[in-house]
Amino acid sequence: MALTQTKKQELISQYQAHETDTGSSELQVAFLTERINQLTEHLKANPKDHASRRGLLQMIGRRRGLLTYIQKKDQQRYQTLIGRLGIRR
């Protein structure tokens, strides 16, 4: 369920902070959100796939940690990011 190269480039162009940004916290959250959405759809079709469910929970935890970090650093950036990604938190 990895992201394709074209999807990664699309996310980078949408969420990068500057021209050479490829790994900022915002981008990491965007990547994780996309993978979480893909995995959620997979689990709807395959409810007994417990290994994938565990991976999903790990990704959600990692995203939660990054969002907490962004929120502590800059509340405005945090609000903008969750609004753009459509995350309720």
UniProtKB/Swiss-Prot annotation:
It comes from the Bacteria. GO terms for cellular component: cytosolic small ribosomal subunit. Pfam families: Ribosomal_S15. PROSITE patterns: RIBOSOMAL_S15. Residues 1-24 are annotated as: Disordered. GO terms for molecular function: rRNA binding; structural constituent of ribosome. Keywords: Ribonucleoprotein, Ribosomal protein, RNA-binding, rRNA-binding. This is Small ribosomal subunit protein uS15. It comes from Microcystis aeruginosa (strain NIES-843 / IAM M-2473). The gene is rpsO.
